[in-house]
Amino acid sequence: MPDPAKSAPAPKKGSKKAVTKAQKKDGKKRKRSRKESYSIYVYKVLKQVHPDTGISSKAMGIMNSFVNDIFERIAGEASRLAHYNKRSTITSREIQTAVRLLLPGELAKHAVSEGTKAVTKYTSSK
């Protein structure tokens, strides 16, 4: 049995080698599927609010699930509203109404004001 003191040192935490594409038997490279998430955006917002605070991968997974869930709820409600009004397009008005219906009180007010600010910034940058 090899002596644990003489074995190769364990790699430092955070130092991961670049993952290369998997090789098939016929020599062709297989493309790895991309996993989309909101993690970079959650991280950017976290750093704006609390610059000295980090987030674990488990917490990031929970935040990603939360954002996906809220997105689906708002999109579904906005779709329903457009259908009720015999419209085929979801506009910012449907999104705003969906947010007002889904989110409680003060949270809805803040979400609507932030959304309006984002739409104004986007239209002025065009």
Swiss-Prot record:
Single GO BP term: nucleosome assembly
Residue positions where Phosphoserine is found in the record: S15, S37
Subunit structure: The nucleosome is a histone octamer containing two molecules each of H2A, H2B, H3 and H4 assembled in one H3-H4 heterotetramer and two H2A-H2B heterodimers. The octamer wraps approximately 147 bp of DNA.
Ranges that cross the membrane: none
Gene Ontology CC, one term: nucleoplasm
Positions where N6-(2-hydroxyisobutyryl)lysine occurs in the chain: K6, K13, K21, K24, K25, K35, K44, K47, K58, K86, K109, K117, K121
InterPro entries: Histone-fold, Histone_H2A/H2B/H3, Histone_H2B, HISTONE_H2B_site
Residues bearing the modification N6-crotonyllysine: K6, K12, K13, K16, K17, K21, K24, K35
Modification sites for ADP-ribosylserine: S7
Modified residues (N6,N6-dimethyllysine): K58
Species of provenance: Homo sapiens
Role noted for this protein: Core component of nucleosome. Nucleosomes wrap and compact DNA into chromatin, limiting DNA accessibility to the cellular machineries which require DNA as a template. Histones thereby play a central role in transcription regulation, DNA repair, DNA replication and chromosomal stability. DNA accessibility is regulated via a complex set of post-translational modifications of histones, also called histone code, and nucleosome remodeling.
Positions of post-translational N6,N6,N6-trimethyllysine modification: K86
Pfam families registered for this protein in UniProt: Histone
Name listed for the protein in its UniProt record: Histone H2B type 1-O
Residues with N6-(beta-hydroxybutyryl)lysine modification: K6, K12, K17, K21, K35, K86, K117, K121
Residue positions, PTM Phosphothreonine: T116
N6-methylated lysine: residues carrying this PTM: K117
Miscellaneous: The mouse orthologous protein seems not to exist.
Residues the record lists as N6-succinyllysine modifications: K35, K117, K121
Residues recorded as bearing N6-methyllysine in the entry: K47, K109
N6-lactoyllysine found at: K6, K12, K16, K17, K21, K24, K44, K86, K109, K117, K121
PTM annotation: Monoubiquitination at Lys-35 (H2BK34Ub) by the MSL1/MSL2 dimer is required for histone H3 'Lys-4' (H3K4me) and 'Lys-79' (H3K79me) methylation and transcription activation at specific gene loci, such as HOXA9 and MEIS1 loci. Similarly, monoubiquitination at Lys-121 (H2BK120Ub) by the RNF20/40 complex gives a specific tag for epigenetic transcriptional activation and is also prerequisite for histone H3 'Lys-4' and 'Lys-79' methylation. It also functions cooperatively with the FACT dimer to stimulate elongation by RNA polymerase II.
Annotated gene: H2BC17
Compartment annotation: Nucleus; Chromosome
